[in-house]
């Protein structure tokens, strides 16, 4: 949980940064690794060797992420929101209970919106065709909930919505 929250904090800051829509791999990787070191120093005063090793592994993953992110930006996708709150009081279909949540990231390209849920390697959930569906039914509800709750985000209408 700490690892995932730490990673999310770095990615949230990236999503709010000036380099979020850069197509330059080095700029993105530099931002992410610098931010990782900055937050690491703030959060862990006397980290164990295991924690330090996890941070270095995370930096390696950020370099890989930077390559994919730069390609995504070059393909026209722009990060428009990071850690976006879904307003309280949202109802799914005709349910009697309220749903709230946070969408990790929202990207836009022309009239398309992509709702993104970050997963860290320590997560039990991995979004693949096999993990998301069984007999054409969703097995993990987070992304489908994002999709339905995106109707409550007025600035996303009337865009085509995809999930990642």
Predicted ranges, named:
Residues 1-6, 143, 147:
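C-terminal substrate/ligand-recognition segments
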Residues 27-31, 79-80, 143-164:
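Substrate-binding beta-hairpin/strand module that engages nucleic acids
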Residues 2, 6-90:
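A non-catalytic, helix-rich entry segment at domain boundaries
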Residues 81-153:
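Non-catalytic protein-protein interaction segments used by genome-maintenance enzymes to assemble
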Residues 7, 62, 105, 146, ...:
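Hydrophobic, well-ordered secondary-structure elements that form the walls
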Residues 7, 23, 33-34, 67, ...:
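Residue-identity detector for threonine
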């Amino acid at each position: 949980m700490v690892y995932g929250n730490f990673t999310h904090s770095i990615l949230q800051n990236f999503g709010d940064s000036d380099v979020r829509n850069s197509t330059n791999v080095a700029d993105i990787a530099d931002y992410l690794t610098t931010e990782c070191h900055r937050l690491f120093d703030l959060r862990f005063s006397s980290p164990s060797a295991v924690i330090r090793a996890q941070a270095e592994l995370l930096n390696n993953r950020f370099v890989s992420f930077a390559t994919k992110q730069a390609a995504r930006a070059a393909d026209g996708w722009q990060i428009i929101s990071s850690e976006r709150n879904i307003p309280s009081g949202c109802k799914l279909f005709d349910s009697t209970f309220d749903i709230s949540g946070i969408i990790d990231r929202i990207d836009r390209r022309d009239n398309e919106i992509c709702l993104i849920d970050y997963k860290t390697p320590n997560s039990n959930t991995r979004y693949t065709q096999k993990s998301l569906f069984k007999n054409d039914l969703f097995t993990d509800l987070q992304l489908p909930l994002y999709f339905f709750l995106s109707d409550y985000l007025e600035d996303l209408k009337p865009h085509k919505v995809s999930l990642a």
